[in-house]
């Protein structure tokens, strides 16, 4: 999709007026950051373009490896890593220096990227943001906030409060959730709520264009509010009471178990499936 946008933009300018930056990636340079922490760390990560991988380890410290990728030394050197620590709060922000000269200069980041490979304690609060890239997280207990401008999000064995959003990409989240807010601008969403998950506050799960699958454990209580603009709703082996609307049509409301906070499911174009985990 980005390539199509790029070509459309390029066609707007006459020959000789555009300086295009971007080529096949040829070099990779690694930069490592290490932070000593004494309690539960709060880790804030961001990269302008590139994937983010987050894994727990058995050390109390936080390690971030930045893989800078570019077509030559100049491209690599234009990638800047900003790192700071205040107590147990760790921030790593990777940015690409912008080019500018006479006339119109179009910079396209497929010539540069920065992947983050992160190791941290299993009990951590994590915020991760990629301007254009996938995010992959596993076995983290704490508050987790994941955001991608354009890329898939995968998370496994999480425990706690989770917020996740992507402008364009699929999402798969598995774990024991309390609070949950999930949105994809364009992509399917699958949520596997493990035993012990509770709607401690309202859950909001939505996609602009794609299917939603929510798997919940036995005994899960909430007020279901599901709607699809163009699709069907399937409720498989899940007892509902106080049902409003017709199951398999585009809107269903009802009580799950003993009720509780709201679980809202919304898709503009796609099916919604609710089943046991």
Task: Outline where the language-model segments fall.
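Intrinsically disordered, low-complexity terminal regions
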Residues: 1-277
């Amino acid at each position: 999709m980005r390539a199509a946008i790029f070509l459309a933009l390029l066609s707007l300018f006459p020959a000789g007026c555009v300086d295009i930056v971007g080529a096949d990636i040829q070099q990779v340079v690694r930069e490592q950051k290490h932070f000593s922490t004494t309690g539960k760390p709060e880790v804030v990560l961001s990269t302008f373009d590139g994937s983010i991988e987050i894994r727990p380890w058995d050390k109390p410290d936080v390690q971030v490896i930045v893989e800078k990728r570019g077509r030559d030394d100049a491209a690599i050197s234009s990638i800047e890593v900003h790192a700071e620590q205040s107590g147990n709060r760790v921030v790593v922000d990777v940015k690409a220096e912008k080019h500018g000269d006479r006339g119109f200069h179009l910079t396209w980041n497929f010539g540069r990227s920065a992947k983050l490979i992160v190791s941290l304690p299993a009990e951590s609060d994590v915020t991760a943001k990629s301007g254009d890239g996938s995010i992959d997280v596993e076995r983290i207990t704490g508050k987790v906030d994941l955001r991608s401008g354009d890329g898939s999000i995968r998370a496994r064995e999480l425990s706690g409060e989770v917020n996740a959003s992507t402008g364009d990409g699929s999402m798969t989240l598995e774990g024991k959730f309390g609070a949950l807010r999930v949105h994809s601008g364009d992509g399917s969403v699958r949520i596997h709520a493990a035993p012990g998950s509770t709607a401690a506050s309202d859950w909001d799960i939505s996609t602009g264009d794609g299917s939603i699958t929510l798997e919940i454990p036995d005994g899960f209580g909430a007020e279901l509010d599901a709607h699809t603009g163009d699709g069907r709703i399937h409720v498989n082996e899940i007892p509902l009471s106080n049902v409003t609307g017709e199951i398999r049509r585009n809107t269903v409301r009802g009580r799950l178990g003993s009720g509780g906070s709201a679980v809202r499911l919304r898709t503009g174009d796609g099916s919604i499936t609710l089943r046991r985990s």
